[in-house]
A protein has these predicted regions:
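Short, low-complexity N-terminal intrinsically disordered segments enriched in polar/charged residues
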Residues: 1-36, 40, 146-160
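A solvent-exposed, acidic/Ser-Thr-rich amphipathic alpha-helical stretch
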Residues: 37-91
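Short, surface-exposed coil-to-beta transition loops
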Residues: 78-79, 109-116
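A short acidic/glycine-rich loop-to-helix N-cap element
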Residues: 6-9, 105-109, 136-145
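A short hydrophobic beta-strand element
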Residues: 90-99
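Hydrophobic pocket/interface hotspot
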Residues: 22, 34-35, 42, 59, ...
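Short beta-strand edge/turn micro-motifs at domain boundaries
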Residues: 113-139
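Short, cysteine-centered beta-strand-loop-beta hairpins and adjacent loop/turn segments enriched
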Residues: 73, 101-111
């Protein structure tokens, strides 16, 4: 759906700007501003989360509650890569990013790479899907058993 008043180029630029703002506000922990980028009925998905953990957050309240807890779980030392890619659909963007940090519960390194797809409707994010390597998370926890038995709200996309 093309946003009223914008041509395809304007919509694509708006989508790419939303993707940039999404990442920068989240990494800066400016959650009150970050959540305003979302549609009321937005969906945040983590398809690679373990089957025992929650993979979908629906609506601004759930999404904000989940993401605002991240700083208490992961210390991000650096964002080592960030690229936003336009797609054929002007209301979709792909985002690649990588972080270096550590899992606070164990002190172990958490150096993760992500690919995410952001979809926009009426100028707001209505769907975000983030893919990451679960093996990095398992290693940060100290192994599979520790990962599976850890607090189910430990890392992005690993909630129950």
């Amino acid at each position: 759906m093309i946003t009223l008043g914008l041509d395809e180029t304007g919509v694509r630029e708006q989508t790419l700007q939303l993707a940039q703002s999404y990442q920068s506000l989240l990494l800066e922990q400016r959650f009150d501003e970050w959540i305003e980028l979302w549609a009321e009925d937005g969906t945040c998905e983590f398809p690679f989360a373990h089957e025992s953990r929650r993979r979908v957050y629906q609506g601004k309240r759930e999404i904000l509650a989940y993401m605002a807890a991240t700083p208490g779980r992961i210390a991000i030392d650096a964002v080592t890569e960030m690229r936003v890619h336009p797609m054929l659909d002007p209301e979709v963007a792909a985002v690649e990013f990588a972080i270096n940090g550590r899992l606070l519960a164990t002190g172990r390194p958490y150096n993760q790479r992500y690919v995410a797809f952001l979809e926009v409707k009426d100028g707001k994010i209505w769907r975000y899907r983030e893919y990451w390597n679960p093996l990095v998370s398992m290693e940060a926890h100290g192994g599979l058993d520790e990962w599976l038995s850890a607090d189910t709200e430990t890392l992005s996309g690993e909630a129950s």
